[in-house]
């Protein structure tokens, strides 16, 4: 008998394939406070029992593989394996189940969103035994959360830096997103900031193209910021997109922005990657820059209800990786966003402690301990008539960002900014006086337009613009109470 055979025999090795559920389905397991918990929406192939499908997810995202291997005997699988500890049927959906999986904390590198996702979703989504798989939610335990630095500054520090309190912040994405020269781009930034906005923004795909190189854009935007600040007496900012082809180039652009003295930069965290995003967040923290995060590419990952990763998971990952703002849908605009689901992950971004609430799609209680919060950004197809609803839905700790809803004003950029600022101030004042924004919103806007010709013109242009499409991502029947 060879030494290798003797070793295999001594550890009880028996070659062959066995059902995952024999090892990885553990319905009597009691989860630990240090476990990372995951809720997967599982659609098994015909003939695959849900217990086997859930166990396969736990195995393939932790220690398991398709066959028994003799090296299993060289470690403690009970210590390191993922466990499918509960399965529930999704009512109203054919052959769909929620499989709950617990992962020991030792499986993950400290402070690495990249490693966390590589482990949990890196390979299992291509598994043939599953027709579809979606990661609905994660419970990040405090023991793991404390290994991350999170947002560079957080909500309160940002308000103190900007000296802006008691209302949502106002922004605008410069349009057209591509094709403007750096000088004309800077002119649009100046007009919007002078009109009353707090921020303007590079769009997600504005990087460094032949028609407008990044350095030229940074310089003209900085000039616009300082000029508008001098004229209005308010602190202004422009989200300078530092996203680049390499981490080194990204940090070089961030350093140039810091040298210009601007307050905020921007990153596309999904296309740029979590490693790059975490590196940039660390740089922003050390150098006093706020970090705006765009979620470009998110719908490729989160749009389908039965496959992918829900945005609430991507939002949690961003809070760990680091960002002071992140786009979060609008509920009322042109982009996907069901109200209760959106409010659920907005709370997960901002609050320190969020209770489990299936009526809002929150599968686990989440304790962020001391990790700073992130401002949700409402952006996409919104205009002045949406202002009461946006103020009511998102509250003060948010950024309301109007692109076409500013630049599409018939009188130009600055009047468009004035219209939005007047509408916001009117809604905040009405709310503070006890009016119901949901019920009285239209009358509040009409009354304010009586003394603001800029708002009156905006109201006339967008009075019939609506986006009446149902959300693809909706609550399950067993979540609706």
From Swiss-Prot:
GO terms for molecular function: magnesium ion binding; monooxygenase activity; ribulose-bisphosphate carboxylase activity. It catalyses: 2 (2R)-3-phosphoglycerate + 2 H(+) = D-ribulose 1,5-bisphosphate + CO2 + H2O; D-ribulose 1,5-bisphosphate + O2 = 2-phosphoglycolate + (2R)-3-phosphoglycerate + 2 H(+). One of its GO terms (biological process) is reductive pentose-phosphate cycle. Binds 1 Mg(2+) ion per subunit. Keywords: Acetylation, Calvin cycle, Carbon dioxide fixation, Disulfide bond, Lyase, Magnesium, Metal-binding, Methylation, Monooxygenase, Oxidoreductase, Photorespiration, Photosynthesis, Plastid. The modification N-acetylproline is found at residue 3. It is found in: Plastid. Pfam families: RuBisCO_large (PF00016), RuBisCO_large_N (PF02788). Mg(2+) binds at residues 201, 203-204. The modification N6-carboxylysine is found at residue 201. Its EC number is 4.1.1.39. The disulfide bond which can form in the large chain dimeric partners within the hexadecamer appears to be associated with oxidative stress and protein turnover. The modification N6,N6,N6-trimethyllysine is found at residue 14. It comes from the Eukaryota. It is an enzyme of class 4 (lyase). The active site is at residues 175, 294. Gene3D superfamilies: Ribulose bisphosphate carboxylase, large subunit, C-terminal domain, RuBisCO large subunit, N-terminal domain. Residues 1-2 form a propeptide. Belongs to the RuBisCO large chain family. Type I subfamily. The basic functional RuBisCO is composed of a large chain homodimer in a 'head-to-tail' conformation. In form I RuBisCO this homodimer is arranged in a barrel-like tetramer with the small subunits forming a tetrameric 'cap' on each end of the 'barrel'. Heterohexadecamer of 8 large chains and 8 small chains; disulfide-linked. The disulfide link is formed within the large subunit homodimers. NCBIfam families: PRK04208.1 (NF003252). This is Ribulose bisphosphate carboxylase large chain. It comes from Cuscuta sandwichiana. The gene is rbcL.
